[in-house]
């Protein structure tokens, strides 16, 4: 079963630019542990870090699909990345997600088949 894991943290980008090499190494170690846990029970389909929300553009609803600078919603909690994993069930996805940095909120959402 495929799941999308969205990783969010309050003021994520400001924090990331301030942390030192040791803190970044801890984050990457957590990613490694997560990757190993998923590989033991399933597959990582994709995983990406996302650029700063200031680099986003959004197409708004409506017939002319206006393009605006920035993310679709303003929020202090920013999505910093995502994983798409194929695991046996939600419990396995939760177990793997617990290995990601504990300062982040992780939304786990099943992917639809069609």
Model-predicted segments: where are they?
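Conserved, structured core segments of small domains
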Residues: 1-114
């Amino acid at each position: 079963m495929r799941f999308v894991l969205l990783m969010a943290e309050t003021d994520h980008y400001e924090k990331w630019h301030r942390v030192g090499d040791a803190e970044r190494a801890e984050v990457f170690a957590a990613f490694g542990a997560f990757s190993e846990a998923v590989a033991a029970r399933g597959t990582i389909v994709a995983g990406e870090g996302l650029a700063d929300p200031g680099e986003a553009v959004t197409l708004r609803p409506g017939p002319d699909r206006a393009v605006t600078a920035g993310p679709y919603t303003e929020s202090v909690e920013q999505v910093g990345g995502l994983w798409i994993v194929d695991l046996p069930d939600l419990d396995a996805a939760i177990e793997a997600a617990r290995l990601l940095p504990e300062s982040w909120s992780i939304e786990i959402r099943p992917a639809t088949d069609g």
